[in-house]
Amino acid sequence: MAGNSIGQHFRVTTFGESHGIALGCIVDGCPPGLEISEADLQTDLDRRRPGTSRYTTQRREPDEVKILSGVFEGKTTGTSIGLLIENTDQRSKDYSDIKDKFRPGHADYTYHQKYGIRDYRGGGRSSARETAMRVAAGAIAKKYLKQAFGVEIRAYLSQMGDVAIDKVDWNEIENNPFFCPDVDKVEAFDQLIRDLKKEGDSIGAKIQVVATNVPVGLGEPVFDRLDADIAHALMSINAVKGVEIGDGFDVVSQKGSQHRDTLSPQGFGSNHAGGILGGISTGQDIVANIALKPTSSITVPGDTINVDGESTQLITKGRHDPCVGIRAVPIAEAMLAIVVMDHLLRHRGQNHGVSTQTPKI
């Protein structure tokens, strides 16, 4: 079955291609009565939107979202919410040279072999353009989580290439085009992007995404563990090649006495587990990191083949991000929000009346 949907109780289904007429999604399962407007969704969409700075692709899409259904007099009705964003700045001629060639490092070859046909314009369905609808749907989840439960989901760029942050100031993130929480690293990020543009190359990145005030108890062992679904959602983002929950791969060198998060009446002594134990939220911050590969859409020539299997070379034309990690920050927030929202509704449906004598720490 086609993999265009995510979630069970809060379910998001997206459609559309990079150079198609429009992008869209259907959001099922949102509780009724949530005050929501196009302006609420637009805030996050503008953070992801292309062409907003010299550090990202210069494709200029307004990404103005339209709410087609599921909202009446400013409130959700409990029915399917239909969202639509029109594509307005396609330059399909930029891709005429790759009609019969496969861009190395992209999904061209695999889509062609799987479906026997591919939309070569900007990558079609495999383009990160599709994530605009995830961000729109995620904005609904973020607002509900914040209003109903005080859950807040935020992310930041923690590393680009060899440049890594040394500190986190949440108030600094929206003050620069890199979503960087360390003001002392902004200039280094700026210089790195400038150098990459001169070279016609790209670079990878790392993003940390955090959910605070998540209730204890979310997650459905054993196959729908909360961390498993988070990893699934984050890995579904274009260019993501690695996901860590909590300390992630650092646990390899840790001892049990160091890694375990001790408990006391005052709370947990640490959060190496990233807010999840046994696939269930602990009530601590949920912390995840994602690693994004450098985009293969670069002007450095690369070896490839054409549809006939013949050797050739390719220089990618078009408008592309030197570092896709920059605009992936709001996408990571959206995907974590969608998963937490889904699990919160699932937990409420099955375990609403559950209580224990043990105090929540």
From Swiss-Prot:
Keywords: Amino-acid biosynthesis, Aromatic amino acid biosynthesis, FAD, Flavoprotein, FMN, Lyase, NADP. NADP(+) binds at residues 48, 54. GO terms for cellular component: cytosol. GO terms for biological process: amino acid biosynthetic process; aromatic amino acid family biosynthetic process; chorismate biosynthetic process. PROSITE patterns: CHORISMATE_SYNTHASE_1 (PS00787), CHORISMATE_SYNTHASE_2 (PS00788), CHORISMATE_SYNTHASE_3 (PS00789). One of its GO terms (molecular function) is chorismate synthase activity. It holds the Pfam family Chorismate_synt. FMN binds at residues 125-127, 238-239, 278, 293-297, 319. Reduced FMN (FMNH(2)). InterPro entries: Chorismate_synth, Chorismate_synth_AroC_sf, Chorismate_synthase_CS. It catalyses: 5-O-(1-carboxyvinyl)-3-phosphoshikimate = chorismate + phosphate. It is an enzyme of class 4 (lyase). Belongs to the chorismate synthase family. Homotetramer. This reaction introduces a second double bond into the aromatic ring system. This is Chorismate synthase.
